[in-house]
Amino acid sequence: AFRYRILGIGPWERRLRTLIEQYQLEDVVEMPGFKPSHEVKAMLDDADVFLLPSVTGADGDMEGIPVALMEAMAVGIPVVSTLHSGIPELVEADKSGWLVPENDARALAQRLAAFSQLDTDELAPVIKRAREKVEHDFNQQVINRELASLLQAL
């Protein structure tokens, strides 16, 4: 069985709390709100999966590549997210995490159900590739060294 912990605050908070109460999900969905980074780190350490179902806002607003996904991948937490904006640049579908279409609750539920059936041997290579992706492609020190090498070659 899954337990969900939704961190942060935002425009959907009131609606989510209402839905949790309406569907009597208080025993499986927790919304602790905003937490300082050291508490978020402790919560990540306890997580089995990191879920970030990003969607395009009604005004067309999109986030780029969420740092929260990078952080989860870097510390070895499997990620499930959406085919949204720059996320596929970070999460390679079925290789370094799992992606579902935006606004597709059924696909998200199916992905989480499938995730729950994976064993450690199946997760290990995905977690390894995710960490390698973040360490190589999104590590500021690596990027700076590569840029310095390019500039020296000019």
Regions from the PLM with identified roles:
Residues 62-69, 87:
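Short glycine/serine-rich donor-binding loops of glycosyltransferases
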Residues 15-38:
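Nucleotide-activated donor-binding/catalytic signature segment of Leloir-type glycosyltransferases, i.e.
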Residues 81-94, 98-99:
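Short acidic/histidine- and often glycine-rich active-site loop of Leloir-type glycosyltransferases
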Residues 45-61, 77:
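Acidic donor-binding loop of glycosyltransferase active sites
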Residues 114, 121-137, 146:
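A short, well-ordered alpha-helix in the C-terminal region of glycosyltransferases
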Residues 93-94, 98-105, 114-120:
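Conserved acidic donor-binding segment of nucleotide-sugar-dependent glycosyltransferases
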Residues 69, 74, 78-81, 91:
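Short hydrophobic beta-strand element within catalytic cores of glycosyltransferases
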Residues 34-35, 42-47:
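Short alpha-helical donor nucleotide-sugar binding micro-motif in glycosyltransferases
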